[in-house]
Amino acid sequence: MAIKKSELYSTLWKCCDELRGGMDAGQYKDYVLVILFVKYISDKHKTDSDFMIEIPDGCSFDDFVALKGHSNIGEEMNKKMASLAEANGLDNVINVADFCDEQKLGKGKDLVETLSGLIGVFENSDLDFGRNRASDDDLMGDAYEYLMKNFATESGKSKGQFYTPAEVSRVIAKVLELDKARKGISTTIYDPTCGSGSLLLRALAETPKGATLYGQEKDNATVGLAKMNMILHGEMYAEIKQGDTINDPQYKDGDGHLRTFDYVVANPPFSTKSWLKSAKEEDEYGRWGPRNNIGIPPEKNGDYAFLLHIVRSIARTGCGACILPHGVLFRGNAEAQIRKYLVAEKRYIKGIIGLPSNMFFGTGIPACIIVVEKAEAANRKGVFMIDAKAGFVKDGAKNRLREQDIRRIVDVWQAQRDVPHFARFVPIEEIARNDYNLNIPRYIEAEDTEILQDIDAHLNGGLPAHDVEQLETYWKICPSLKSDLFVPHATRSGYFALACAQDAIRETVNANKDFRHQAALFTESFVAWCNQHRSRLYELKPGHAPKRLIEELSSSLLEIFKQDRSLVDAYDVYDCLMNYWSETMQDDCYLIASDGWKAELYTPQPMTKSKDNKVKKAKKAATPEDVVCDLLPVPIVIDEYFPEMKSCILAAEEVLNDNETKLSELLDEHEDYFDTDNFADKKLNDTNVKKRIKTLDKVKDAEELDTLNQYLKYKEDITVTKRLIRELKYKLLSALLVRYADFTEDEIKRLVIEKKWFAALSTRLDGEMQRVVQQLTTKVIALAERYAETLPQIDLALADLEAKVAGHLKQMGFAAVRTDL
């Protein structure tokens, strides 16, 4: 049975994280990733006779496993890594980590246990990299990416820069339209600051026929990460070179000029200081300098040095995208001259995408993506800008683009259409009038969320028409809703009053005819989407492509809900599907791609070995809660086939809870009777309570006797009810075992598709509709409360309170205090 990918990766990280002890994550990754590498090449070597990595005798992952528990494990691992590196030209790539380093791994027994445990993590039988379960399943690549992200997150400031967040990489790959690159390996993609290579690989993944990858990285250890990453993703011909890109570029043509590429992607280190070393102010490669009429980037800030290198490295018909801090858009002096050169003289900058702050590892400052395109530069009339700073979700200490944010950016970019407060095509003439300052807020006005206080309304009452019209989004879709919530003020033109009680606003919204109509249309749109894809889902079989499936499902869902005039934003609906895909449906589809429509029950085993390394007894199922089915969850089957048995169990549990509550209340109410000093051995239990009862006088101690007998009655009822629940649950478990064994494939399909996938999505979409109702209710209540009391009313209330205070003071013998001074 295949394991869920998300469960596998989270287990990998959890085990690795536990084993690293106090070691810095930035150091520990060197050990974890190289073991993952050995596991991968060993699995591939077993199944792929054409696999290009050579494994010398005694250097397979199985040979590493054989070292577990040996006192010389570190020394032997170093030897095997050295042999693997020498055989494959990977010196200083896979043999950087020292497996004998006692400072990092501990001494003696601790070192042996740490390394044995690390190898054990990757012994997982489900971690088989020799085969992919689906046509688009990159188990190895996804595992490596997952671990890299977690290491970057844990590495802290300045140590996580080797990794570009996958969401940003996806945006770059989409806006460069790499899906149109159809020349296969003759297409070239270059990253001058490639880090671990994740951005390069994300760009490659977008191409329909592949490409050839080139990268350069200054840090030698990170070069090793990138080379391993390429091999692990099957990119054996990718070329990664080490060196300072600005001062020692490695990619040159036969004449010594910089080589050019079809696509260039980059996430260079932000604001590098003292970048100008062996490079000259009159650059020999023509990137900057007076001879080329290009300004020289300031020595204390290397952002434009990288951008100019990228511009020079793009082929005449090519394009590129670079992540840079927002400061490059508006800083003055030399950088302003370079902006003018790029925007007005060469017209290379096609667009700018402003990103949320605190997205990148190692820095919290906001950044942007600058898109450069040479092919259409001569005819370019302006720069397309997107202000995407507001779209994100908090993810630990960092911000992350949501699926809907990525899709919204890409859709607007591809359409090149203006969207109020979000995107705009800015003519070069307008940019020139602003002295080539590209700061996005100069050109895209932020949405006005400021609350304007109407002094007249505060003085004389009423709800300002301006405030009511700010809710125009709702009135356009539900015209009658406005009149159900507001009526013109009886005496004041231009002002409204609530048409219903404040506590009836939510009820009024839900009862409104237009709202009910559009809510029905919203439901109909979802039903239409389900009908459109039902047969496609029923036809899923082993070997299908889950990534292609979700692209089809999500695109059609977004298209349907864009056409639906709904209060719920279509991109919020899209996000519901993508989140459910990430959390649940993706795992289901990969299980189907691997094993087909199989619904197998199993009992999760928390661990296979005890602390003394002895095999623990397998846990046996006694209740429905003890068994699990990943594809077809047990609760769905219970609801569908055994609702009466479930009701009986719930009723018994309710009785149990009631008796336990009564027992707890009895103990609290009569603490003196249940004081442990009253019982043998100072222990409160049934036996001692019975002994206590025998010593009490029926008349003198009647109340205590009744209380103790009631205690025993509750305890007996609880025992009997627990026994009944166990019997009912065991009976239900037996029925479940039979039911799961008898399931046909058609039954499994119906339950998974209709009762699991569609039902879960329907619930999430209903939640989005209710969220809209809550938002409107909150806004209307806030508006009503803002002007609930006029200033004269407040003055009267204040005067009344002052009079009361003065009266109290007078009664107490104090002179009245003047408040009008």
Question: Regions from the language model: what does each represent?
Answer:
Residues M1-L176, K180, K241, T245-Q250, ...:
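Non-catalytic, mostly N-terminal accessory regions of nucleic-acid modification and defense proteins
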Residues S158-A266, S271-E282, W288-N293, Y304-A305, ...:
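Conserved S-adenosyl-L-methionine
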Residues T11-K14, E18, D24-F37, I240, ...:
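Conserved Class I SAM-dependent methyltransferase catalytic core
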Residues G108, R133, G215-D219, Y263, ...:
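Hydrophobic alpha-helical scaffolding
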Residues F270-P298, D303, H326, A336, ...:
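Accessory, often C-terminal, charged low-complexity segments
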Residues E18, V121, S125, Y146, ...:
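Conserved, well-folded catalytic cores of nucleic-acid-processing
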Residues I369-V410:
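Conserved P-loop NTPase
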Residues A205, I231, E235, P269, ...:
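Hydrophobic alpha-helix feature that most strongly marks membrane-spanning transmembrane helices
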